[in-house]
């Protein structure tokens, strides 16, 4: 979820801003298939379960904060990788993404690497969903291209994923 609200918007952090260029470079230089997610909420966000626990409007569909960061968009335009449609998700993890990856790669020998925001919420949720859908596939997370809500929660999420056989690079 390399979206404006997570980088320099309503939920942005210094750490998130610091990974934009490394993430863009990774996208630009990647060869393979790129899938992505977009945190997507509606105007009623504050009345949802998530909104009650995190009462900060963010990633409202169609607003500037919902859009991908411009440097990330430029990298997507320049990459030679095959970029697939990004999955819109109203929750931390994307069941749709896990299902697409399962249907596409279940009988193939592939590696899946995750990058992005936020390590301790969406990245860990998606990593666990993907690992559950594809238990024999190597799943990894590039920690240099991730940031959490806080540096401590970022580290905790990396440790938790490591315990679930997700490689941290």
Language-model features, listed with the residues they occupy:
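Short beta-strands and strand-loop turn motifs
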Residues: 115, 139-144
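A short acidic (Asp/Glu
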Residues: 46-48, 124-127
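Gly/Ala-rich phosphate-binding loop of Rossmann-like dinucleotide-binding domains
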Residues: 131
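Conserved N-terminal glycine/acidic-rich loop preference
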Residues: 86-125, 147-169
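Active-site acidic carboxylates
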Residues: 2-85, 107-108, 136-140, 149-163, ...
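Short, contiguous clusters of charged residues that form electrostatic/catalytic patches at enzyme active sites
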Residues: 21, 66, 70, 95, ...
